[in-house]
Amino acid sequence: MGLFDKFLKKEEEINLPALEVADDEIVALADGELIDIATVPDPVFAEQMMGKTCAFKYGEGKVVLCAPANGTLGVLFPTGHAYGVVMNNGVELLVHCGVDTVNAKGEGFRLLNKKQGDAVKAGDPIVEADIKKLSQNYDMSTMLIITNDNGLGLEFVDPQPVVRGQKVTK
């Protein structure tokens, strides 16, 4: 901590209304559109090679991406482009914001008040993404992947408009 650190402007916290979500539910990360996964221009996601996958599109500007379920933040990439949640029932989820956005090296992403290993509730803010800035160089489809469904046979709902906290599995 430097001598003048206390004078530096701190980033303001992002507070969103708390959600009441059951431990076995998977929900939308933010307000947007759940789109057909086959339209994502990356075969790893479009062909669901990592597990059952859905994709979201968000409006221009900044979007706060939240935890899709109750559990533990199992992984949080320092670049902000991806994070994973291990649900309380053992189901493992991965959120990947944009295609090839690892190449942005964190530009356009801001980590929010959570760190790897933290307990999270569905709807807790994890990352802020500047969709307008990032979409200049990347497809900004945001994928939600069930990398391990713990034998539950989970399926995503059909494409539709969604709001943060809306259940997205059948």
What are these regions (language model features)?
Residues 2-170:
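Contiguous, well-folded functional domains in the mature portion of proteins
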